[in-house]
C-alpha cells in the first residue's frame, strides 16, 4: 500500500507500519530517504515525489517569470486590474493563507518548522526573523490582491477561476492542478517558482508517496520483496508512463525528465530546493496554528511578529498536551 510521506514517520512511530529495508536498486537520494525515516528507522520505500511549481498562461506570457521582481512588475500591468475592486490586481496569485503553499516564502527567508532537519519539535522556527520576513513579503502581495484572497475556504477556487479565464498570468500550485487545467483547455506552461527578492529559492515542502508495509503483515518477507520489485528502475519508469507521477528512483527520474514534459521537468528541478516535510507526529500540531498565523498577519488583524509568536506558543502548548513535550 501507499502512504503520503508526511504520514509515514508518524504511523511508523505509532507502531502501525513495519520497518522497510531500502534496496540498492531503489536508487533513492538523501531527500527521499529522509521522508521515510523517523528516529533512525525506515518505514517506507520512496515511490513518487511532488512539490509546488509555477503555472503560467502562455497566451499572456512569452516565458515564465524567473524572479519575484518580475512578478511585481507584472502586477503593475492594468490589464490584470480586478474590475470589482479599485487598486487591486490579479496578474499573479497564490493561496498564501494555506501554510502548505506559503511555506516556501518562510523557508526561503530562513524560517523552518522544526530544527535538526525537521526532527526536533522543541526547536520551532516559525517566528524567527526569516519567517517573519517571509510573512511580511506575503503581506505586500495581499495589499495588491482582491479581498477574496483572504477567504481561507474560497481562495483556491478564486485563483483557479481567474487563471482559467485568462485574468491571471501566473499561479503557484502542485502537479495535481494540471489535470483540471488541461480539462479547461488552458494554454499553460510549467516552470520552477521564481527566486525570492533575497535571491534565494522558494523552498516549498517536498512530498509525495511511499510504499509501506502494515505492521503485523501476514507475510512480511514477501511484502518486502514486493516493495523491492515496485521500486526498481523499470517499475518506476512504468509507473511514470501510466500516471505521470514523478519517480523517487533517481534513474527513473532522469528517464521521466527525458520525456520532455514541462510539468515533470519543473517538479524535478523544484524538488532540488524543496525542504522535506517533517514526518514526525508533532507535525500534526502545526497546520491549524500556522494557517491562523498567516490569515491574522495578511488580513492586518495582527502584526507578522505577533501572529508568528502566538502561533508558535500554541504549537508548543499543543505538543506538550499531546506528546508530553518529549
Where are these regions (language model features)?
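Long, aromatic- and glycine/proline-rich binding clefts that accommodate carbohydrate-like moieties
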Residues: 191, 240-289, 296, 320-326
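Short helices/loops that flank or line small-molecule/ion binding pockets
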Residues: 14, 73-80, 157-171, 292, ...
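Short helix-initiation/N-cap motifs at beta->coil->alpha
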Residues: 6, 69, 149-164
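Extracytoplasmic/periplasmic solute-binding protein
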Residues: 43-47, 52, 72-124, 168
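Hinge/lid segment of periplasmic solute-binding proteins
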Residues: 3-52, 63, 68-74, 83-87, ...
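Glycine-centered hinge/linker elements that transmit conformational signals in sensory
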Residues: 75, 120-152
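Extracytoplasmic/periplasmic substrate-recognition and gating elements
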Residues: 40-42, 143, 182-244
Amino acid at each position: 500500500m501507499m502512504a503520503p510521506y508526511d504520514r509515514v514517520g508518524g504511523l511508523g512511530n505509532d507502531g502501525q507500519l513495519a520497518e522497510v529495508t531500502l534496496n540498492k536498486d531503489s536508487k533513492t537520494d538523501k531527500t527521499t530517504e529522509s521522508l521515510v525515516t523517523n528516529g533512525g528507522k525506515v518505514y517506507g520505500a520512496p515511490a513518487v515525489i511532488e512539490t509546488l511549481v509555477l503555472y503560467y498562461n502562455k497566451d499572456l506570457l512569452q516565458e515564465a517569470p524567473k524572479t519575484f521582481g518580475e512578478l511585481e512588475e507584472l502586477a503593475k500591468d492594468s490589464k490584470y486590474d480586478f474590475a470589482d475592486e479599485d487598486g487591486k490586481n490579479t496578474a499573479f496569485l497564490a493561496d498564501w493563507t494555506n501554510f502548505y503553499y506559503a511555506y516556501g516564502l518562510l523557508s526561503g527567508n530562513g524560517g523552518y518548522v522544526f530544527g535538526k532537519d525537521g526532527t526536533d519539535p522543541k526547536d520551532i522556527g516559525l517566528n524567527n526573523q526569516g519567517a517573519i520576513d517571509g510573512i511580511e513579503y506575503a503581506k505586500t502581495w495581499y495589499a495588491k490582491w482582491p479581498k477574496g484572497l483572504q477567504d481561507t475556504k474560497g481562495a483556491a477556487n478564486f485563483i483557479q477561476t481567474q487563471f482559467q479565464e485568462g485574468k491571471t498570468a501566473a499561479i503557484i500550485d502542485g502537479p495535481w492542478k494540471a489535470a483540471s487545467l488541461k480539462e479547461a483547455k488552458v494554454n499553460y506552461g510549467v516552470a520552477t517558482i521564481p527566486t525570492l527578492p533575497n535571491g534565494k529559492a522558494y523552498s516549498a515542502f517536498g512530498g509525495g508517496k511511499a510504499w509501506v508495509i502494515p505492521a503485523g503483515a501476514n507475510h512480511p518477507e514477501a511484502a518486502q520483496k514486493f516493495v523491492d520489485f515496485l521500486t526498481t528502475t523499470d517499475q518506476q519508469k512504468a509507473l511514470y508512463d501510466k500516471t505521470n507521477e514523478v519517480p523517487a528512483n533517481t534513474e527513473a527520474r532522469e528517464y521521466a525528465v527525458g520525456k520532455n514534459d514541462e510539468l515533470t521537468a519543473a517538479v524535478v528541478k523544484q524538488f532540488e530546493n524543496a525542504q522535506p516535510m517533517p514526518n514526525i507526529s508533532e507535525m500534526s500540531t502545526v497546520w491549524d496554528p500556522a494557517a491562523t498565523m498567516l490569515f491574522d498577519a495578511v488580513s492586518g488583524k495582527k502584526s507578522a511578529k505577533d501572529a508568528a509568536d502566538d502561533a508558535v506558543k500554541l504549537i508548543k502548548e499543543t505538543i506538550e498536551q499531546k506528546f508530553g513535550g518529549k
